[in-house]
């Protein structure tokens, strides 16, 4: 059997999906509050930058993978308009339910689907844009997921990955203290769940750095891959194209 990482823990590949699902079932109801606390609200600016770079226009078809509580899908649905199509998807039913309800409460009706990014249930060359924000690091076979994203995007379209990355070196020690001490403490105080937030910190540490992710996207068949460091590399936005 093949092994993979669940945070720092080595587990069988068949176990990882269930363990990740357990984390997000646990955090779903407090996800937005915790995002604001953990990032000091910066996650909103990171997503705004992603939305600006996406360039969604009326009539566009957009797939938001691991869309969680729907921040990107909400913006894209407004930009794509009634002639467009924006799918909010997530592999976790609890997260998808929170995202769907949040969009409905804002008066936004857009299709939602449970979706495994390694087996995307859409035809080839269907979307103008595919996005995944803070979800790739939780996937077992990242290159396979990226190849699937490339498959369903149209020639001329983009795949965009917004994810925690390698922080600027002078900030590493302070960032580690925050990630492994403060973050689990916040998780316990606000959500009553320190272990899930400890996993989130560990999953960030185990995720490929900026250059490694460029190579991974290129291996998946994407071209002209570039990245933008945000907040000293705490987060990076990677953009790959299909021709």
UniProtKB/Swiss-Prot annotation:
Pathway: Quinol/quinone metabolism; menaquinone biosynthesis; menaquinol from 1,4-dihydroxy-2-naphthoate: step 2/2; Cofactor biosynthesis; ubiquinone biosynthesis. SUPFAM superfamilies: S-adenosyl-L-methionine-dependent methyltransferases. Keywords: Menaquinone biosynthesis, Methyltransferase, S-adenosyl-L-methionine, Transferase, Ubiquinone biosynthesis. It comes from the Bacteria. Its EC number is 2.1.1.163, 2.1.1.201. S-adenosyl-L-methionine binds at residues 69, 90, 116-117. One of its GO terms (molecular function) is 2-methoxy-6-polyprenyl-1,4-benzoquinol methyltransferase activity. GO terms for biological process: aerobic respiration; menaquinone biosynthetic process; methylation. It catalyses: a 2-demethylmenaquinol + S-adenosyl-L-methionine = a menaquinol + S-adenosyl-L-homocysteine + H(+); a 2-methoxy-6-(all-trans-polyprenyl)benzene-1,4-diol + S-adenosyl-L-methionine = a 5-methoxy-2-methyl-3-(all-trans-polyprenyl)benzene-1,4-diol + S-adenosyl-L-homocysteine + H(+). Belongs to the class I-like SAM-binding methyltransferase superfamily. MenG/UbiE family. Methyltransferase required for the conversion of demethylmenaquinol (DMKH2) to menaquinol (MKH2) and the conversion of 2-polyprenyl-6-methoxy-1,4-benzoquinol (DDMQH2) to 2-polyprenyl-3-methyl-6-methoxy-1,4-benzoquinol (DMQH2). This is Ubiquinone/menaquinone biosynthesis C-methyltransferase UbiE. The lineage of its organism: Bacteria, Pseudomonadati, Pseudomonadota, Betaproteobacteria, Burkholderiales.
């Amino acid at each position: 059997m093949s092994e993979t990482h669940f945070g720092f823990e080595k587990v069988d590949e068949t176990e990882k999906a269930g363990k990740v699902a357990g984390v997000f079932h646990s955090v779903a109801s407090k996800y937005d509050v915790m995002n604001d606390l953990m990032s000091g609200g910066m996650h909103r600016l990171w997503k705004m930058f992603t939305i600006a770079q996406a360039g969604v226009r009326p009539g566009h078809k957009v797939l938001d993978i691991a869309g969680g509580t729907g921040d990107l899908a909400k913006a894209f649905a407004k930009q794509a308009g009634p002639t467009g199509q924006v799918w909010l998807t997530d592999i976790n039913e609890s997260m998808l339910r929170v995202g769907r309800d949040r969009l409905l409460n804002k008066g936004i009706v857009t299709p939602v689907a449970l979706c495994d990014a390694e087996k995307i249930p859409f035809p080839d060359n269907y979307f103008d844009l595919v996005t995944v924000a803070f979800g790739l690091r939780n996937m077992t076979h990242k290159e396979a997921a990226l190849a699937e994203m490339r498959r369903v995007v149209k020639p001329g379209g983009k795949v965009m990955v917004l994810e925690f990355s390698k922080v600027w070196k002078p900030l590493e020690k302070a960032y580690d203290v925050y990630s492994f001490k403060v973050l689990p403490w916040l998780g316990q105080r606000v959500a009553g769940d320190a272990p899930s937030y400890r996993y989130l910190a560990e999953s960030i540490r185990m995720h490929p750095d900026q250059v490694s992710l460029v190579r991974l996207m290129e291996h998946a068949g994407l071209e002209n891959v570039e990245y933008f460091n945000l907040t000293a590399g705490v987060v990076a936005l990677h953009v790959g194209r299909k021709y």
